[in-house]
Amino acid sequence: MKDYNVQRWAFWALAAAFVVDFLGYAFIVPILPSWKAQFALSNTEATALVSFWAVPLFIFGPKTGRITDRFGAGKTILASLFLLTISALLYLVATMDLPIDGFYVLALARLIHGASGAAILTAGFAAASQIWPTRFGEMSGKLIAMATIGGLLGPVIGGISYEIDPNLSFILLAILTAGVIPLIYVTTNDLGKGDEPVQGGVPISVFINNPVLFRIGLLVMMTTLATGALEAGVPLFLGEELGLNSGWIGAIILVMVLAQGAGGWLWGTLVDKNGPVRYMIIGWSLVTISLISAGIVAWKITDSVTAAYYIIVILGVFQFAIAAAQVPMLPMVDTATSQAYGKGGAGLAFGAFGTAWAAGTIIGPLIIGPVYDYTNSWAVALGILAVPMAIGLLITLRNKEMLSDCYTSEMANRVSE
């Protein structure tokens, strides 16, 4: 019973950290058009603010992994929550009258948020892989679902509170983030005390030289490329092209994040039961079709209400399906690292995973914004995202036996232990 209670509290502590992490990430989505007008930003600059969140994750992903392995997931997450709180208050500072351009303060806030968010992701997944070694697919799927809840609440809370009082909104974000600190504090030891990795640290070159991990990294990057691009571009498309108000925009974003949350919960459980590859193939196929469909809707349908209904369905399918492509890769990177290099470097493994995740999150918004600025066509900007999705499908199909063998053999070893 004690172990069950420890695991239960550990899950809810990790879940709360993931919620506030992604709540802050998505908090600015409905505010982005206001910032664009306030700071006279181009579409490229506005979408770049979304990308900035992922820059520290890309650069410092492996470093946060080493920190996690050395000091423990609990302490790493605890320190990161303090930084998240500071970054929330920096958003408030950016909107004040300053001697410098507020855009640079916004960028700094996003970078700090990204650095602390990177550590939470790395430490959280590393802790989950150690606490639930044979149920990691299920638990990582649930954690992604909880992160999605944060992504759901972020635009809603951010949009409503910003409309009431712009200053109040960022104070509220800081309070919500700081509120998780006590829960992480009391579960710090349960999440992992930390120690030197058994192998002395998995060299980062492994994630390039190992064929399984390299392919997983490419696939991770492609999934987050699409989601990052849509998170940045969809609010601008709905507002500028279709003329929808904040209520419609919020409703469509609501469907997107609910669909991904449901998908993350479902696919993670199915992966533990049946293996990952079949669900990855389903996911890649559906996301490719949905993005082509989104481009066609943006091109053909001019009535804003009709287009909005189509977009709700299409992007709901996309978000549900992207979870099928994305969630299985979490247990796969865990098992592939353990199989090739032994145990002891879970933090570094997920830090490198985070680097691939961040690469796509950075590239995505920097594709959709400039493509639209250059072509002045949302049909092209949305439809072009189907290309990397189709490539992801081809990579999965060509390497399905390698990916499946890696996963099934390692999980068999864990069950026998």
Predicted regions and their residues:
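Central cavity-lining transmembrane alpha-helices of secondary-active solute carriers
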Residues: 51-65, 254-266
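C-terminal ends and interior cores of transmembrane alpha-helices
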Residues: 82-99, 286-304
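Conserved MFS/SLC helix-loop-helix module at the cytosolic interface between two early adjacent transmembrane helices
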Residues: 59-98
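Helix-loop-helix hairpin linking two adjacent transmembrane segments in secondary transporters
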Residues: 143-188
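Short amphipathic helix-loop junctions that connect adjacent transmembrane helices
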Residues: 30-44, 232-247, 335-338
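Juxtamembrane intracellular "pre-TM" segments in multi-pass secondary transporters
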Residues: 1-5, 189-217, 414-417
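Cytoplasmic helix-loop-helix junction between adjacent transmembrane helices
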Residues: 109-147
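Cytoplasmic membrane-interface "Motif A"-like loop-to-helix N-cap segments
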Residues: 70-81, 273-287
